[in-house]
Amino acid sequence: MSVIKMTDLELAGKRVFIRADLNVPVKDGKVTSDARILASLPTIKLCLEAGAKVMVTSHLGRPTEGEYNEEFSLAPVVNYLNDALDCDVKLAKDYLDGLELNAGELVVLENVRFNKGEKKNEEALSKKYAALCDIFVMDAFGTAHRAQASTHGVGMNAPIACAGPLLAAELEALGKAMDNPARPLVAIVGGSKVSTKLTVLESLSKIADQLVVGGGIANTFIAAQGHNVGKSLYEADLVETAKKLMVECAIPVATDVACAKAFDENAEAEIKNVADVQDDDMIFDLGPDSTAVLADIIKNAKTILWNGPVGVFEFKNFEAGTAGISKAIADSEGFSVAGGGDTLAAIDKFGIKADVSYISTGGGAFLEFVEGKVLPAVAMLEERAKA
């Protein structure tokens, strides 16, 4: 994967347009979770320290396109940046016809979704963005799977288009895990439904040495082995697909599970052999034997790709499976990449952040990359690197 990297460019005096992911939760005009801003700060600081004229923008929420709506303004982000940086950060509302900036100055361009034509990647808007800059920096992996004016079109028209440090690190980590992985490669796919992760499972079954399934997905595989799954969430219409995947790839299926009679955080966990699951049982987690077997597989892996918890880890009585998998990943000496919202919540809950080699910032983009799909923003950067 060959792209121009921002860190290889001379930025002094240049007008630099950074497309970041500053789509943060806001309540009462205050940023309530700053993780995405913190992730973008090093890129912004590098540009400022290099003496660039810096513009940074993002989407925030889902406003009606083409209409200003204060509820979705980037103003709270600007307030946050003013506190975090040693410079005066301004918010520009009307910027499409040009901006005057000085070297070492930072301006936040208002929510790109206030501009008509953003989502449809319209050429006229893309060219207006491009006219603002000498260098376009794509640094929002979380939106790299969308071809929009601020993620794709601008890069096709800007004098130079490059990958920011965040995006470059993401592509490097995912490439290391998928393109030429140290083996054995173990992929862990959790979540509630096979249908939503089917293309991920099919893609990983072709490259993984072992594919670990968990959550509601695992129930469909248990059913595919002819076992009763009671009232558990599973997809009867995908049992044949599960059987096919088990032929194509080594998929260790649970031998024991944690059940309850109702979906309730106070429900007692009953550990059962899969052959003993009753019609009124609901499977909510892996049992201790299955967790131990999978933990051994993970500990011996050279590369680990993790997307999704293996049980209802939000409930104290059904967290043991995901806790065991998390510990195995933390203890493994292999290279590990984790991504997806629920996965990040599990990493936080079990305190293994420092032990995961790379944590992906992109939800949908992470999944599409793992599915083997071409991400439009990345394809654009590769094309521009050839020019």
From Swiss-Prot:
Q: Where is it predominantly found? A: cytoplasm
Q: List GO BP terms, alphabetically.
A: gluconeogenesis; glycolytic process
Pathway where this protein functions: Carbohydrate degradation; glycolysis; pyruvate from D-glyceraldehyde 3-phosphate: step 2/5
> What InterPro entries has UniProt attached to this entry?
Phosphoglycerate_kinase, Phosphoglycerate_kinase_CS, Phosphoglycerate_kinase_N, Phosphoglycerate_kinase_sf
Enzyme Commission identifier(s): 2.7.2.3
To which protein family does this belong? Belongs to the phosphoglycerate kinase family.
Subcellular localization is given as: Cytoplasm
Q: Where does ATP bind?
A: K197, E314, G340, G341, D342, T343
Q: Which cysteines are joined by disulfide bonds?
A: none
Q: Which UniProt keywords apply?
A: ATP-binding, Cytoplasm, Glycolysis, Kinase, Nucleotide-binding, Transferase
Provide the residue positions that the database annotates as binding substrate. Answer: D21, L22, N23, R36, H59, L60, G61, R62, R113, R146
Reaction catalysed? Answer: (2R)-3-phosphoglycerate + ATP = (2R)-3-phospho-glyceroyl phosphate + ADP
Q: Which molecular-function annotations from GO does this UniProt entry contain?
A: ADP binding; ATP binding; phosphoglycerate kinase activity
Instruction: Describe, as the record does, how this protein assembles with itself and its partners.
Output: Monomer.
Q: Which domain of life is it from?
A: Bacteria
Name this polypeptide is given: Phosphoglycerate kinase
Gene Ontology cellular-component annotations: cytosol
